[in-house]
Regions:
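The feature captures the beta-strand-to-loop junction immediately N-terminal to the Walker
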Residues: 38-40
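ABC ATPase nucleotide-binding domain helices that frame the ATP-binding cleft
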Residues: 46-49, 145
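Conserved ABC transporter NBD signature motif
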Residues: 61-69
């Protein structure tokens, strides 16, 4: 194991009685890295996270943290802490009591408890909420407390299971920014689970795109977005047009990599179908012989077109897929 590796999964298999689960998973997470497991419901991402945390037993394989095998340790014996979507705060305890709970179990002296909790409340921007109960706070505030409580345990690896999915869009975006700042400032190693590609792209050092219990691609957000290795990844991440070719292959091109001009030409001809303002950019769809193609244009460009106009589309950067599993530039 490299000296920079904090967490390693070696041929990890976790199966349920139904036979579903994940098989032969191999992954390394470096110290201070935030790695996101991204995929649709049922792909196995939460199974992996809960297996790392010890909440689901591994069928075979190994989980190592700092080179030490923790595969068969109970959750409370592992150097990990987990934050759930449902917050898991004790409703009958105040914020302070919730945050002190784990420290008491670890027999941390009271003075040290108070010091750590005061510092953590400041870090998660919840100073002054010590005497409030969970039911008196918003979802975002409760999640701040849940994250702070986990960080108080000073875990080697922090596990986050879709922690922001119950929050509205604006609060979710704010919480993402705050988590990333805390993670970077403290140098914490994090494994994050989400089905939200925007969340994964915004937060992650690396993303693991999952499909039916396997890894489709592991890479930086830029690598995943710009160089998807399979049609599945290309379709799952961001917007993508799939254009069938005469030789049976498919061209995949993102809306921002298509340009439009008036009239007909040698590329892809069609007629303007819709022009929609989506904030700082305009989405245009064009009816062509091979189906509807989506592209993004500026507001200034949009003023030059109207529904029904004949146009020609020029494809910029694209990838060619010969089947569902491979791609070529």
């Amino acid at each position: 194991m490299s000296g920079n590796v904090k967490l390693e999964l070696r041929n990890l298999t976790t199966l349920y009685k139904s036979g579903d689960g994940v098989r032969n998973i191999n992954l390394t997470v470096n110290k201070g890295e935030l790695v996101t497991l991204l995929g649709p419901s049922g792909c196995g991402k939460t199974t992996i996270l809960r297996t790392i945390g010890g909440f689901i037993p591994a069928t075979s394989g190994q989980i190592l943290i700092d080179g030490k095998d923790i595969t068969h340790l109970q959750p409370e014996k592992r150097p990990t802490a987990m934050v759930f979507q449902s917050y898991n705060l004790w409703p009958h305890m105040t914020v302070y009591e919730n945050m002190a709970f784990g420290l008491k179990l670890r027999k941390v002296p009271k003075n040290e408890q108070k010091r750590r909790i005061t510092e953590m409340l400041e870090l998660v921007k919840m100073t002054g909420y010590e005497k409030k109960y969970p039911g008196q706070m918003s979802g975002g505030q409760q999640q701040r407390i849940a994250i702070g409580r986990s960080l108080l345990l000073q875990p080697d690896v922090l596990l986050l299971d879709e922690p922001f999915s119950a929050l509205d869009a604006k609060i979710r975006s704010q919480m993402r920014e705050e988590l990333r700042k805390i993670q970077t400032d403290l140098g914490i190693t994090v494994v994050f689970v989400t089905h939200d590609q925007e969340e994964a792209m915004a937060l992650s050092d690396r993303i693991v795109v999952m499909n039916k219990g396997t890894f489709e691609q592991v890479g930086t957000p830029q690598e995943i977005y710009n160089h998807p290795v399979s049609r599945y990844v290309a379709d799952f991440i961001g917007e993508m047009n799939f254009i069938p070719m005469l030789d049976g292959s498919t061209k995949a091109v993102r809306p921002e990599n298509i340009s439009v001009s008036h009239g007909t030409g040698k590329d892809l001809d069609g007629y303007v179908r819709t022009i929609m303002m989506l904030g700082h950019y305009i989405e245009m769809t064009v009816d062509t012989d091979i189906g509807i193609v989506k592209l993004y244009i500026t507001a200034e460009e949009a003023e030059q077109y109207k529904k029904g106009d004949p146009v020609t589309l020029t494809l910029g950067d694209y990838r060619t897929y010969s089947d569902h599993q491979s791609a070529a530039e």
